[in-house]
Amino acid sequence: MAPEPPAPYRDARPFALMYIPRLGSTWNKPVLEGTKTDTLKKGLGHYANTTQLGQKGNFAVAGHRRTYGDPFKDFPKLRPGDAVVLTDGDDWFTYVIDKRPYRTLPTDVQVIDPVPTKSGYTRAGRYLTLTTCDPEWGHSHRLIVWGHLDSTQPVESGKPEALRR
């Protein structure tokens, strides 16, 4: 029998913590379900129509660049090879960024498709998409980074390598 699909995340509720070492050793933000304004005031928002952590498809997350804690203020510093680590309290999920930030228009919703083709991906996988506004104090464009799931491990086994450097 196939494993049961995970239960849906609860709207506007936190379900994970995200760590991006490139943005600082103390940088971590809650990830909540949904991308409504009130949700993004509290942390990062998971696009509800995208896959869940570690699942096949595209786990996509939005965050403000400025305002509400400036979670993605330093987004342009992200580089290929950078780790994005998430935990849901049970497991660690380490994604690795594959490309430098890509600038596009807000109407370019294909960036969060299950296989985001502008990323260069051509087949199904376990992907991560991060989105934020550009310019820093505006919202005429979006910056996007894409990554792939590199590893998972239970929380009991300790922090992943990317957080121990």
Predicted regions mapped to residue ranges:
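Extracytoplasmic/periplasmic soluble domains downstream of a signal peptide or transmembrane helix
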Residues: K36-T50, Q55-R165
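Extended boundary segments
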Residues: A2-A48, L163-R164
